[in-house]
A protein has these predicted regions:
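N-terminal trafficking/processing presequences and adjacent post-cleavage segments
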Residues: 1-22
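Intrinsically disordered, low-complexity regulatory segments in eukaryotic proteins
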Residues: 26-33
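Amphipathic, interaction-prone secondary-structure segments
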Residues: 34-71
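A short, surface-exposed interaction/processing loop segment used at functional sites
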Residues: 69-87
């Protein structure tokens, strides 16, 4: 799977995941322009990407494509805190 195809699949999956779980009282549905790629990498036959959205829920979506086994994985994380630690 090429990088472009992989990132398109990731974006579609974030939209599908969010829209199937969002509270209906929020009156929000995600569209393609609400999803962005934070980071991505392709090594040999494998792809990995970290995506997020314009929604202020702190969720990150990590995707991995294992090119050897032709398997796709999605992990969803919640950013709990970001703080500076002085050394």
């Amino acid at each position: 799977m090429g990088t472009k195809e992989f990132l398109e699949w990731c974006t579609e999956e974030v939209i599908r995941y969010f829209n199937s779980r969002v509270d209906k009282t929020d009156n929000k549905t995600l569209k393609e322009e609400d999803v962005f790629v934070v980071w991505n990498c392709k090594t040999l036959k494998n792809n990995k990407a970290l995506l997020s959205t314009t929604v202020s829920d702190g969720l990150y979506y990590e995707f991995t494509f294992n090119g050897n086994s032709e398997e796709l994985y999605m992990e969803v994380y919640k950013k709990w805190e970001n703080r500076c630690i002085n050394l």
